[in-house]
Amino acid sequence: MSESQPGASSTTSNKCDSGFIPGDDTFTQWRNIFSILMGKMTDEGKEQFRVARDLRNEAADCKRCEDQRDYLLQYSPVIRYLSDNIRQLGGDLHSHNIYCRRCTNRKAGGFDPEYGILLCANEMKDQGHLEDTMAHEMIHAYDHLRFKVDWSNNLRHAACTEIRASSLSGECRWAREFFRRGQWKFTQQHQECVRRRAILSVRARPGCKDEAHAEKVVNEVWDSCFRDTRPFDEIYR
């Protein structure tokens, strides 16, 4: 009996500290949801809840992501257009190297020149979000083949491809900013979104010193990279 007491104490302590109650049954899940709605769960508890939910739904999330990925590869005009242009440059992106996985670092996706594209299945809100994410990463793939991007050592290269990916993928269109991110400005909204997301991305790179450094690099390449809409004739979405 004495051996079980520390575990029980730990569970009680965890609940008191964060407000999160471990458990996969429906009753426990609803208790956690109500705790969040009532403002009784800490940020740490909310993250514990999200991790538990993502683990519980991993198979279903990945299956839905794969089904939507395959549909978009076949029927989405922007995804098909980018696929064709990547193929013309000697690349090949299809279901065999566009992976749906559960991610732990709260990002939507990523591109790696060796392995392909990662789609974070547990972060996808809907098929539109998945389409924007695929388009974003496919523009990185296009840039890698077309412009020989130095991902590791050149922050200007990284800033330029982030500007282009955010501008051309559709993730910065007005409706997405207004309804998803609470950005309610009507003038210069697209440019501000692109700039903001490019700075955040550059800031996260190892060679970047701080936010001021990231902003400086983005500003240095802004004019030429924002105007460059290749492979599109203009901003498509």
UniProtKB/Swiss-Prot annotation:
Keyword Membrane on entry: yes
Localization: Mitochondrion inner membrane
Parts forming coiled coils: none
Protein's name according to its UniProt entry: Mitochondrial inner membrane protease atp23
BP terms from Gene Ontology: mitochondrial protein processing; mitochondrial proton-transporting ATP synthase complex assembly
PROSITE patterns listed in its UniProt record: ZINC_PROTEASE (PS00142)
UniProt keyword list: Hydrolase, Membrane, Metal-binding, Metalloprotease, Mitochondrion, Mitochondrion inner membrane, Protease
Keyword Cell membrane appears in the UniProt entry: no
Pfam families: Peptidase_M76
Domain of life of the organism encoding this protein: Eukaryota
PANTHER family: MITOCHONDRIAL INNER MEMBRANE PROTEASE, MITOCHONDRIAL INNER MEMBRANE PROTEASE ATP23 HOMOLOG
Enzyme Commission code(s) on record: 3.4.24.-
Gene field: atp23
Principal subcellular localization: mitochondrion
Family statement drawn from the similarity comment of this UniProt entry: Belongs to the peptidase M76 family.
Residues reported to bind a divalent metal cation: 136, 140
Cysteines joined through disulfide linkages: none
GO molecular function: metal ion binding; metalloendopeptidase activity
Topology relative to the membrane: Peripheral membrane protein
